[in-house]
Amino acid sequence: MKKLTALLLSAIMALSLTACGGSEPAPAPEAEDKTVVIGVDDTFAPMGFRDEAGELVGFDIDLANELLGRLGYEPKFQVIDWSMKETELDNGNIDLIWNGYTITESRKEKVNFTQAYLDNKQIIVTMADSDIATKADLAGKTVAVQKESSAYEAVMADAATAATLAGGEPVQFDTNTDAFMDVEAGRSDAIVVDEVLARYYIKLRGEEQYKVLAEDFGSEEYGIGVRKADTEFLAEIDAELTEMINDGTFDEIKGRWFSAQ
């Protein structure tokens, strides 16, 4: 009986070792997810916006499709609350911020940026019949901007001008389109906005209706926002962006949306 028991115990131990040991190959890992979720504001023409058919189009959309496609990724564009973009990135809800995203010192504390790929300015736009001609004329006026935008940062960085505005700061709107509409309705006196968007918008709506002031709130550059931890991904994107600039693809895509530039 003891011998039989010992044999049974030996068999059980052998089976246990076979199941737990390293002699059997480990299961193959699941295929890497190649989808990249990109956070966008779908009202930011011509970088990323809806066409008449409701399709998401624009310079950044074309650029992202080409660049990520070359790297073997599948881009997925996710419309987000632009004021929450860095939070969405940090929480892992999106993988990139890529939609006319201005490089600023405050944003560098939250995200890593690729190289700059497009120049921009924060310009002042009024209706054509406005008596506003200079920054000084904004004193006591209501100035519209997009919420949590680089336009807001640029105005507030000019402390002397910001202090003179009605309310001591710009009025913030969810989108630049909402801000423009408030100016058109006469509730706001001016809008501070990305030149890239403004030139496209006023050309579409009728340039004769608007006035662009000679003064502005400074020059800036657009970059792609990447999570701080994703350093290898950042390098991968940067290298491919450089390749696209060098081989002419970048300029070809840019020409579709900025024919005069």
Q: Where on the chain are the PLM-derived regions?
A:
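Short helix-initiation/N-cap motifs at beta->coil->alpha
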Residues: 61, 76-88, 170-185, 220
